[in-house]
């Protein structure tokens, strides 16, 4: 059988620990037998990041800007323990954070829904994609512990020296104050990424803040979204048969619990941080969550939403068998290959990606799965497979489709 051809390379970012092992298994078993794979390879494993003083991460992001589509393996973000374990020169930053900043991207997370793994919210039938604004607010805050009585003010000093002053509070005793900010550019980029991704996936877009209480800060987010929507996306949304819907964050939470799913929920930074964990947990498993970084210029980077599965890796190093869920990593590959196929008008590549996703889901629904899914499935008499045999079972399903 002739292999499917590619015209433009994918940017391939390799990673760490157990996900790095799965990465090679997935390529060898599910991709290379069928596709004449073209990739520009970057090793984002912690050892090589350390060797290159993290330059490899910057290079991979630049390549993603150049080619437009990347697929990324999970990577270690070092802490004190990792500094010792890997003998690091310094505590390198999160690769995801570096790439996100360089691409000015928004992260969209969505669950992979399969029969037999029911969400905690019984009416959720379709995935809920969560878009989190990843800049500013409480994550770039400045805080002061107030020692005693006094006046707290918010002061903005323009370049020409003029000042705007607002009283925060007249303290009669000790307390706490916090200053947060965001930028027009960052909010606009977030809005464009959300509208583009909604059109791309043909899903309704919800956005929510607390503009009734935060009449300037949150209202600014609301206004930026509305203005960009009216000016650049309303006609496109109408033509696609999808809608943009704004509501208050508390109303959005209430509506989400009663909804059937099948939409994108855009959130400010803190709301997105909290709600993405709620949504992923309620759908059943973080190992069944996809993640795609979308830039306002239309650049895409696909990865699994989970980490490097450190515990399984240490078992693997001892020669012990692991049953590690590779579904989200497989879907990172299919997402990237599909997008590459769409951009390059390669129907065979798009068809392959869709078929591999269906084969992965069908394998689980036929009762063959990894241990983590066997613990939460409602299916009876399931077969628990090890990491490698699960990937081989997917290939068997794929070949019979």
Name each region found by the language model.
Residues 256-355, 362-363:
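Glycine-rich phosphate/nucleotide-binding loop
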């Amino acid at each position: 059988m002739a292999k499917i051809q590619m015209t433009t390379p994918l940017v391939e970012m390799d990673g760490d620990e157990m996900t790095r092992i799965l990465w090679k298994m997935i390529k060898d078993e599910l991709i290379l037998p069928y596709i004449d794979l073209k990739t520009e390879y970057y090793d984002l494993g912690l050892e090589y990041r350390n060797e290159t003083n993290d330059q490899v991460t910057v290079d991979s992001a630049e390549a993603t800007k150049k080619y437009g589509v990347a697929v990324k393996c999970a990577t270690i973000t070092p802490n004190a323990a990792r500094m010792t374990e890997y003998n690091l020169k310094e505590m390198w930053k999160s690769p995801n954070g570096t790439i996100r900043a360089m691409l000015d991207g928004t992260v969209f997370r969505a669950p992979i829904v399969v029969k037999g793994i029911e969400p905690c919210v019984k009416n959720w039938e379709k995935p809920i994609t969560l878009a989190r604004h990843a800049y500013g607010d409480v994550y770039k805050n400045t805080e002061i512990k107030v020692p005693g009585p006094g006046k707290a003010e918010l002061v903005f000093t323009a370049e020409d020296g003029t000042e705007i002053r607002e009283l925060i509070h007249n303290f009669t005793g000790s307390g706490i104050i916090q200053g947060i900010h965001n930028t027009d550019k960052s909010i606009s980029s977030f809005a464009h990424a959300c509208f583009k991704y909604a059109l791309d996936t043909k899903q309704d877009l919800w956005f929510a803040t607390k503009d009734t209480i935060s009449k300037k800060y949150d209202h600014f987010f609301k206004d930026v979204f509305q203005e960009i929507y009216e000016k650049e996306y309303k006609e496109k949304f109408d033509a696609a048969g999808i809608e943009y819907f704004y509501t208050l964050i508390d109303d959005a939470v209430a509506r989400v619990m009663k909804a059937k799913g099948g939409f994108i929920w855009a959130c400010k930074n803190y709301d997105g941080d909290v709600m993405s964990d709620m949504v992923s947990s309620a759908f059943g498993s973080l190992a069944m969550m996809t993640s795609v970084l979308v830039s306002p210029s239309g650049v895409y980077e696909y990865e699994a939403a989970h980490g490097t599965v450190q515990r399984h890796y240490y078992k693997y190093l001892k020669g012990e068998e692991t049953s590690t869920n590779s579904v989200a990593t497989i879907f990172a590959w299919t997402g990237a290959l599909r997008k590459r196929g769409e951009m390059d008008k390669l129907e065979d590549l798009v068809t392959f990606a869709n078929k591999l996703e269906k084969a992965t889901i069908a394998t689980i629904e036929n009762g063959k799965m990894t241990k983590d899914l066997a613990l939460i499935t409602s299916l009876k008499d399931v077969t628990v497979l090890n990491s490698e045999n699960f990937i081989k079972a997917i290939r068997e399903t794929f070949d019979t489709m």
